[in-house]
Amino acid sequence: MASKTILIGPTGFLGPAFLKMDPSILAVGRSPLSSNLTNEFVEISSELDFSPLDNLDYENVIFLIGSSDHKILNAHPTMAFEKNVLALSSFLSYLKATRRKINKVVNFTTMLQYDSMKIKIPCDEKQPRNPSV
């Protein structure tokens, strides 16, 4: 039996490319999908409220919520943290609180999450983390 995958943040830069490659991926986000995508869509009202996922069947997550608009992010000192770290932290807390069994969470971000002073290449998930703005 194939694992069900959800993609959170489907309307940004990478989301549509993933969804076009695999119509079975369930899209989860605040904004509706473009009309050329046939993936099923689940709306969430906020990038910090994942309760609409409570009754969904999924084992894998592609997490794409974030922002790389450097002009806006540089003008608002805390916005990069809010857009690129809080949503992921909230989602991981949601998974823990609901005791959801997940095979993988793949996160794409514009922020460096690993400690740049301790990072070793190639980088894996066991590297020391130190997200910074």
Describe each PLM feature range.
Residues 2-23:
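N-terminal Rossmann NAD(P)H-binding glycine-rich loop of SDR-like oxidoreductase domains
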Residues 8, 28, 61-65, 105-111:
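SDR active-site strand-loop-helix element
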Residues 15, 71, 115-116:
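Glycine/Thr-rich phosphate-binding loops of Rossmann-like dinucleotide-binding domains
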Residues 24-34:
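Conserved glycine-rich Rossmann-like NAD(P)H-binding loop of the short-chain dehydrogenase/reductase
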Residues 32-49:
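Rossmann-fold cofactor-recognition segment
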Residues 44-83:
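NAD(P)H-binding glycine-rich loop region in Rossmannoid oxidoreductase-like domains
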Residues 76-90, 129, 133:
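Glycine-rich NAD(P)-binding loop of the Rossmann-fold in SDR/ketoreductase-type enzymes
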Residues 89-130:
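Conserved Rossmann-fold NAD(P)-dependent oxidoreductase catalytic core, especially the SDR/UDP-sugar
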